């Protein structure tokens, strides 16, 4: 095993080869789930993936198509209500 693969920053994936042997493939771990910028709740609609995996996705799969996609829906509603009330 290579020295760099001894650390736990690499995920171990056990793969059965056609010859019947079980070998270990090393993969980088997935990043943490995206969180709301205000309350810190996990965001839905944003995939977990390394940058090279996300690069292959279309733009609509990378983030929600609504105003303020970095906020959860409840925080977004709260801000939009405050903005609407401030303009009156």
From Swiss-Prot:
Gene Ontology molecular function, alphabetical: structural constituent of ribosome
GO (cellular component) term, any one: ribonucleoprotein complex
Keyword list (alphabetical) reads: Ribonucleoprotein, Ribosomal protein
Q: Where is this region: Disordered?
A: 41-72
GO biological process per UniProt: translation
User: Does the keyword field hold Ribonucleoprotein?
Assistant: yes
Q: Which residues cross the membrane?
A: none
Family in the record: Belongs to the eukaryotic ribosomal protein eL34 family.
Q: By its UniProt entry, which HAMAP family does this protein fall under?
A: Ribosomal_eL34 (MF_00349)
Q: Provide the protein name.
A: Large ribosomal subunit protein eL34
